[in-house]
């Protein structure tokens, strides 16, 4: 039996429970119908959330995929009830509490390059600052 070799690793963002075959998946070179079925099954509890996904495609058209947590920027916009962040970091467009920022840091800890909640919180606070979201005590 031939050994499977990796042909491509792709990172794409899809809406939870709503993946459809399309150009983003076609370029990866996998069975799109099977992928969308498996992806939608795994993300049915996260309907409408943006889910980053890392797809590993193999030479025999098989694949593996890993689901990541929702991006910090989207979580911050949801917490501050915003459509989008500020055009520049000096313009304040919304506010969230420190408790909410800690909650986001705790949720994102598994995917961030941080070992502690405090380090993850610094990353979340930096993202909030760049988006024009003020963090209040």
Curated annotation (Swiss-Prot):
One of its GO terms (cellular component) is cytosolic large ribosomal subunit. Signal peptide: none annotated. Keywords: Methylation, Ribonucleoprotein, Ribosomal protein, RNA-binding, rRNA-binding. GO terms for molecular function: large ribosomal subunit rRNA binding; structural constituent of ribosome. Pfam families: Ribosomal_L11 (PF00298), Ribosomal_L11_N (PF03946). It comes from the Bacteria. One or more lysine residues are methylated. GO terms for biological process: translation. The keyword tRNA processing does not apply. Forms part of the ribosomal stalk which helps the ribosome interact with GTP-bound translation factors. Part of the ribosomal stalk of the 50S ribosomal subunit. Interacts with L10 and the large rRNA to form the base of the stalk. L10 forms an elongated spine to which L12 dimers bind in a sequential fashion forming a multimeric L10(L12)X complex. Belongs to the universal ribosomal protein uL11 family. PANTHER family: 60S RIBOSOMAL PROTEIN L12, LARGE RIBOSOMAL SUBUNIT PROTEIN UL11M. HAMAP family: Ribosomal_uL11. This is Large ribosomal subunit protein uL11. It comes from Mycoplasma pneumoniae (strain ATCC 29342 / M129 / Subtype 1). The lineage of its organism: Bacteria, Bacillati, Mycoplasmatota, Mycoplasmoidales, Mycoplasmoidaceae.
């Amino acid at each position: 039996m031939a050994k499977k070799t990796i042909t491509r690793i792709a990172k794409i963002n899809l809406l939870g429970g709503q993946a459809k075959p399309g150009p983003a998946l076609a370029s990866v070179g996998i069975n799109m119908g099977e992928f969308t079925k498996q992806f939608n099954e795994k993300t049915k509890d996260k309907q409408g959330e943006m889910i980053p996904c890392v797809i590993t495609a193999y030479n025999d058209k098989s694949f593996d995929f890993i689901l990541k947590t929702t991006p910090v920027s989207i979580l911050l916009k949801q917490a501050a009830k915003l459509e989008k962040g500020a055009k520049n970091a000096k313009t304040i467009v919304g506010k969230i509490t420190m408790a909410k920022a800690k909650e986001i840091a705790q949720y994102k800890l598994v995917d961030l390059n941080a070992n502690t909640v405090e380090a993850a919180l610094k990353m979340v606070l930096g993202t909030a600052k760049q988006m024009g979201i003020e963090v209040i005590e």
